[in-house]
């Protein structure tokens, strides 16, 4: 029996599933975040090597094919680096490197027509039509993109607290939430935290949860941030729908990502706004890594004599 490895590498955590050729999972492992742009090549290699070794040790087998879903894989330069990382840790043949939305799409869309909208630390929309054409929107990283993501929500909340602090914006309950979440005494201390050294961006992304709590309690500033996040996510999805000509035929919309899981009201708002007669909008119940397993199985079958 041959085996395959599927890896979902996110900005906050990494999941790996080792499965038999028939798709039955025989081992799994979790690791830290793995993103070339924010963690660096060596850190990504360390995480991928660790989860691969852990699954192989648990099952007592080595995979015959591997598929990696990770942010940034759509850029040719990053994809080449990722393939080299996989080669260094022992995977030279039957290797698939793709973006994180692709594996979520495969995991959640049996017909493989439609799109995945991922909202985690970052965000991206990626889809495929019946003719095999693919399109994406967003996913350009936290400096210039990732609109609507956990980081985007957290960063805007911090901005609004500081604006309210110096009189450029309204007072907001987010100020107290900021102090508690980051364990600081004064809102301006967050500036020193962020610029003072290696400040993990996932800490800002995790601030999205207190933002949602403030919105539920009626804070207008927090509510506006979440409404804007939903609009950005819907825009990304609708852009992919338009570019692929999906409207008018049955298609899936797969919602995935840690921020969607942590902020169900945000996910529900996005799902409502993307509802259409032709669209089957669903939350991804399983793991995106299961989509990577399926892509690895396909690579294994394609290489069979």
What residue ranges belong to the model's regions?
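Phosphate-binding/catalytic loop of phosphoryl-transfer enzymes
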Residues: 73-171, 303
């Amino acid at each position: 029996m041959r085996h395959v490895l599927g890896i979902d590498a996110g900005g906050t955590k990494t999941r790996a599933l080792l499965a038999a050729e028939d798709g039955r999972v025989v081992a799994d492992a979790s690791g830290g975040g793995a993103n070339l742009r924010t963690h660096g090549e060596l850190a990504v290699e360390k995480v991928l090597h660790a989860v691969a070794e852990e699954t192989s040790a648990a099952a007592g087998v080595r995979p015959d094919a591997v598929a990696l879903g990770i942010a940034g894989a759509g850029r040719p330069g990053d994809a080449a680096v990722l393939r080299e990382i996989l080669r260094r840790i022992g995977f030279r043949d039957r290797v698939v490197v793709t973006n994180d939305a692709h594996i979520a799409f495969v995991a959640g869309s049996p017909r493989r027509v439609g799109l995945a909208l991922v909202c985690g630390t970052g965000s991206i929309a990626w889809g495929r039509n019946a003719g095999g054409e693919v399109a994406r929107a967003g996913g350009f990283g936290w400096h210039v993109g990732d609109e609507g993501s956990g980081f985007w929500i957290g960063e805007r909340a911090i901005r609004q607290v500081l604006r309210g602090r110096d009189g450029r914006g309204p007072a907001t309950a987010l100020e107290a939430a900021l102090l508690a979440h980051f364990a600081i005494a004064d809102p301006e201390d967050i500036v020193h935290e962020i610029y003072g050294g290696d400040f993990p961006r996932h800490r800002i992304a995790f601030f999205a949860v207190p933002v949602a709590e403030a919105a539920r309690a009626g804070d207008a500033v927090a509510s506006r941030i979440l409404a804007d996040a939903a609009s950005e996510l819907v825009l990304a999805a609708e852009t992919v729908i338009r570019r692929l000509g999906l409207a008018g035929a049955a298609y899936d919309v797969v919602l995935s990502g840690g921020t969607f899981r942590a902020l169900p009201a945000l996910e529900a708002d996005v799902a409502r706004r993307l509802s259409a007669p032709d669209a089957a909008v669903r939350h991804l119940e399983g793991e995106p890594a299961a989509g990577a397993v399926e892509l690895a199985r396909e690579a294994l079958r394609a290489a069979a004599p």
